């Protein structure tokens, strides 16, 4: 197994992002579903959001017992939003999780750390449309792999009712999308979900 490989696990294809000893960090190749980040329009962090509860509950339970034994629990740090200082909340022990903003910006889709840590003087919203690594973050729907969609990151946005996301063009929405209420027809902010996990191999 090597970084960049696509492997089958459960009912999805996953991309290998990192390898440490006998474990690999993997993320679904496609957006496997669309869900709000939380089930109430109130300030929340990853530790208490409905999406985390779902991923470590119903989504995790879809795996066979043999597959569950291969999923390694991990303690995730949840840093504050680098630009806005919004609290990332408590550390969490997760079996299934979303990537953090640092994961997406600095580690697993090329290194754009200089853009994350050195915003321009008046830059407040879009991360960086000319980021050369944007294309590496673009994702399509599992149900229609020709349809590009935006997907959630677990880091909070500029306020506690928003969470960071990856735009359809791969750009990092550092200010965040609303965790529940959106401007689309059903009134909900149904962001794409790309679960990640550490897999024993």
Where are these regions (language model features)?
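Collagenous Gly-X-Y triple-helix signature in extracellular proteins
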Residues: 1-201
